[in-house]
């Protein structure tokens, strides 16, 4: 019934829960997501709540009583961490410089054109290895990568540019959507309809038909046909390939994608707390058994339920 994929919410016990969009970054005026939402005509209609400036994320470890704050704004980010790691000032400074530098190579991310010559070597920099090259301090390594669940951080696979693009937005500014992430989807649907567009729900696309080396139309399970010039699929690439009867892609590319290993999902518990039992904090908490924050995805069925 709902639209929006991970923007969807659900209600239990009279309380609304987000499924995917719990908080978002880059919403201060002039920042990337603000620019996109403003262009789409929904920014002024979104109700947003800015998170804790001095620690919108708190990284926590077993047997360590300290909470490690991820501060908002790069100066504040450095201030919060150098107060805990005074001997690591240079590493923290370099981390911030390198994150911002990598983000400059992605014009769509920055909503601008640039003259940077893209270096493909950037795509091969490993997040874990790069953070380890910045500092030998185990705690600081764990803190800098402590919210890697945001991009399903994987020891030998997660590239640093992905880490940079995501963390940069949150460090710039972090917000919660008042009323739930589905508000974004509802506002977009309203805007599309205002501009004369149509939004269809519960339409199961079973085939993408081609003509002249382009996708020409989509066919749904109830035999409706939708013609168009551009088709965007946000389902799993493997499933998208199955919909294209006459493949427009090289077999070698399809085989490579089909042979890629899927990442591990997460087990999520949503809880309604008893009123007036736990004080509200305008922060997120990431908890780990050790300073090794990369072991989560390395999981075997035999380990359940640890």
Model region roles, listed by residue range:
Residues 1-94:
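N-terminal glycine-rich phosphate/pyrophosphate-binding loop and immediately adjacent elements
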Residues 18, 113, 146, 168-176, ...:
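Glycine- and acidic
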Residues 21-26, 148-153, 266-268:
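Glycine-rich phosphate/pyrophosphate-binding beta-alpha loops
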Residues 62-158:
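Rossmann-like flavin
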Residues 144, 149, 157, 189, ...:
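Ligand-binding pocket scaffold of soluble enzyme catalytic domains
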Residues 164-221, 229:
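Helical element adjacent to the flavin cofactor pocket in flavoenzyme catalytic cores
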Residues 176, 206-306:
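Mid-domain catalytic core of redox enzymes
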């Amino acid at each position: 019934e709902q639209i929006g994929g991970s923007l969807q919410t659900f209600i239990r016990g009279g309380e609304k829960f987000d499924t995917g969009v719990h908080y978002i970054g880059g919403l201060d005026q002039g920042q990337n997501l603000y620019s996109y939402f403003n262009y789409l005509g929904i920014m002024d209609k979104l109700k947003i709540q800015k998170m804790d400036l001095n620690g919108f994320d708190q990284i926590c470890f077993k047997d360590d009583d300290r909470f490690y704050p991820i501060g908002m704004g790069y100066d504040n980010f450095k201030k919060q961490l150098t107060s805990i790691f005074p001997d690591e000032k240079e590493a923290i400074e370099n981390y911030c410089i390198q994150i911002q530098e990598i983000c400059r190579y992605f014009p769509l991310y920055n909503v601008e054109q640039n003259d940077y010559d893209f270096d493909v070597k950037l795509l091969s920099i490993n997040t874990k290895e790069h953070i380890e090259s910045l500092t030998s301090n185990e705690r600081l390594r764990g803190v800098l990568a402590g919210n890697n669940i945001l991009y399903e951080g994987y020891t030998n696979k997660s590239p640093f540019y992905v880490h940079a693009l995501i963390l940069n937005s949150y460090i710039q500014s972090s917000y919660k959507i008042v009323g739930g992430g589905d508000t974004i989807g509802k506002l977009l649907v309203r805007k599309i309809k205002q501009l004369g567009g149509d939004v269809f729900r519960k339409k199961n696309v079973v085939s993408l038909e081609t003509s002249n080396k382009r996708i020409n139309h989509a066919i749904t399970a109830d035999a409706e046909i939708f013609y168009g010039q551009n088709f965007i699929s946000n389902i799993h690439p493997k499933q998208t390939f199955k919909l294209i009867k006459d493949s427009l892609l090289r077999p070698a590319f399809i085989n490579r994608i089909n042979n890629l290993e899927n990442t591990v999902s997460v087990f999520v518990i949503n809880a309604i707390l008893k009123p007036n039992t736990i004080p509200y904090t305008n922060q997120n908490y990431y908890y780990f058994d050790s300073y090794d924050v990369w072991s989560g995805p390395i999981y075997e069925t035999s380990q359940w339920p640890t």
